[in-house]
């Protein structure tokens, strides 16, 4: 029997939100997704190709570096002052990849970045395992260990995306993982020191429409990782070899990492992390509006994290948390729209 207006106020609220109600909230939140679908701020990149050890390797590393830098400059419009490139041999605008130049680059980034900015660090080259717990990225001259890279990154404000594509790269995941960071490595063990094919497919991901799994015309770090991981598996299958290269991603800060086929709790941050800047996301001069945009970005991330935990969360708890987030997203989005 339908409740009347007279007794409607005494009706008990439903224990769980209805699917229709949640769907309505989701649709409402989606109306505002173009206002702020990721965090605002500038994008920076440090791309390093280290000591090659031979002409064949040098040519491959240079090809991957040049291709990726062209993507950042041409497709994603990275400004020259926000894109630092180091290589085995010096050329115009590209210093040698020495320990001193790496340290100088991080000092420069630390002075220029803000908490709203994002830095990508891409390492292409050879890696060396020291004792199973530590590894080095081979530079021209003295190398830097994973711990030393961590020390250089620790003072940086903003968000970090670190991609180490070398053999023996797993210790970098353990040493560099942290809150607000997305860390990718080409291997799941320090003992895997063979030459890797992961960088070839990672670089290719940002120019291949097939990498855009959700068809939103952007390739997230999760999508690039998934694409590259599939490329690695297919490469070994075509060679008829047992896969010895297993890429990992960590964005929970646990320092454990997961494969693309078994993400567990990892992947929520990576799914909403993009390399390309978006003019829509530039923070406005209006401090109130800027604060709303930051809050919306935080809620987007929380929503992705919640979705990643769905299988391990009791249904009642999941629905309640989802409702709370969607209501808040809709509220903040409406305020942004009113001020835009």
List PLM regions with ranges.
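Short, low-complexity, charge-dense intrinsically disordered segments
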Residues: 4-34
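Solvent-exposed loop/turn segments at secondary-structure junctions
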Residues: 51-55, 89-93, 125-130, 142-145, ...
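Sec-exported extracytoplasmic/periplasmic mature domains
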Residues: 53, 66-80, 107-114, 154-158, ...
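Boundary/activation segment at the start of structured domains
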Residues: 37-120, 127, 134-136, 143, ...
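Active-site-proximal C-terminal subdomain of hydrolase catalytic domains
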Residues: 66, 160-253
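Disordered regulatory segments flanking catalytic cores
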Residues: 36-43, 58, 241-340
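Second-shell loop/turn segments in exported
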Residues: 51-59, 88-96, 134-140, 186-192, ...
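Extracytoplasmic/secreted proteins, especially bacterial periplasmic and envelope-associated proteins
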Residues: 56, 60-67, 71, 97, ...
């Amino acid at each position: 029997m339908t409740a009347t207006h007279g007794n409607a106020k005494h009706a008990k609220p439903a224990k769980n939100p209805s699917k229709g109600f949640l769907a309505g909230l989701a649709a409402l939140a989606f109306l505002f997704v173009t206002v702020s679908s990721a965090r605002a701020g500038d994008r920076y990149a440090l791309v390093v190709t280290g000591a090659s050890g031979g002409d064949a390797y040098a040519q491959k590393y240079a090809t991957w570096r040049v291709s990726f830098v062209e993507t950042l400059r041409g497709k994603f419009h990275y400004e020259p002052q926000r894109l630092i490139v180091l290589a085995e041999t010096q050329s115009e605008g590209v210093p040698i990849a020495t320990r001193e130049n790496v340290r100088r680059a991080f000092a420069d980034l630390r002075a220029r970045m803000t908490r709203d900015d994002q830095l990508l660090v891409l390492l292409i080259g050879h890696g060396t395992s020291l004792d199973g717990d530590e590894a080095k990225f081979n530079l021209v001259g003295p190398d830097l260990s994973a711990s030393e890279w961590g020390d250089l990154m620790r003072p940086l404000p903003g968000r970090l995306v670190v991609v180490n594509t070398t053999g023996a790269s797993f210790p970098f995941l353990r040493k560099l993982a942290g809150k607000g960071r997305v860390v990718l490595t080409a291997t799941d063990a320090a003992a895997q020191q063979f030459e890797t094919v992961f960088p070839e497919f990672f670089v290719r991901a940002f120019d291949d429409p097939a990498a855009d799994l959700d068809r939103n015309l952007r390739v997230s770090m999760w999508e690039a990782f998934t694409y590259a991981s599939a490329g690695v598996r297919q490469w070994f299958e075509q060679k008829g070899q047992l896969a010895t290269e297993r890429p990992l991603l960590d964005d929970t800060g646990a320092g454990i990492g997961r494969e693309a086929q078994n993400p567990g709790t990892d992947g929520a941050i990576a799914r909403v992390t993009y390399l390309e800047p978006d003019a829509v996301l530039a923070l406005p001069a209006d401090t109130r509006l800027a604060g709303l945009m930051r809050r919306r970005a935080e809620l987007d991330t929380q929503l992705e994290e919640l979705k990643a935990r769905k299988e391990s969360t009791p249904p009642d708890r999941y629905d309640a948390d989802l409702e709370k987030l969607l209501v808040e997203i809709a509220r903040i989005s409406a305020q942004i729209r009113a001020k835009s």
